[in-house]
A protein has these predicted regions:
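Secretory-pathway ectodomains
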Residues: 1-114
Length: 114
C-alpha cells in the first residue's frame, strides 16, 4: 500500500514531492493515481496524475476546458473514485463528473450531477 503525507507520496524506490498537498491516492495493479488539493486562489486545474509503482510519471489528466469548451469554466477536481471496471471518475465543485481513461489520462465523457 502506497502511503502519502502532506505533499509527498512514498514509493519504495523514492518519495515523490508535489507542489500541492496530496488529497487522494488510488492504487491499481499497474499505477498509483494521485489527486492534489489545490488552494482556491491558485490557477492549477489538472490536478490528477498517474505514476508507475516505481514513481515514474505516466500522465496528467487532460484539460476539461480544452476537451469540452462548452463547460466555460475549468475547476480542479475535488473527488475521484475507481470503479470495479477500472473506470476512473473525477468530479469538481460544480457537480460535473468526468470519466478518465486510466491508461492515458484522457477524458472520455462528462455529465452534470447536481
Amino acid at each position: 500500500m502506497i502511503k502519502f503525507e502532506d505533499k509527498t507520496v512514498f514509493f519504495t524506490s523514492q518519495p515523490i514531492v508535489f507542489n500541492f498537498e496530496v488529497g487522494d491516492v488510488i492504487e491499481t495493479p499497474e499505477l498509483v493515481i494521485v489527486r492534489l488539493n489545490i488552494p482556491a486562489d491558485n490557477q492549477t486545474r489538472q490536478n490528477v496524475f498517474a505514476l508507475k509503482k516505481d514513481g515514474k510519471f505516466v500522465w496528467q489528466v487532460e484539460s476539461s476546458l480544452k476537451k469540452y469548451p462548452e463547460i466555460n469554466v475549468e475547476l480542479p477536481y475535488e473527488n475521484m473514485t475507481l470503479l470495479e471496471d477500472n473506470k476512473l471518475i473525477v468530479s469538481d465543485f460544480f457537480g460535473r463528473t468526468f470519466d478518465v481513461n486510466v491508461t492515458n489520462g484522457k477524458l472520455l465523457n462528462f455529465k452534470v450531477t447536481r
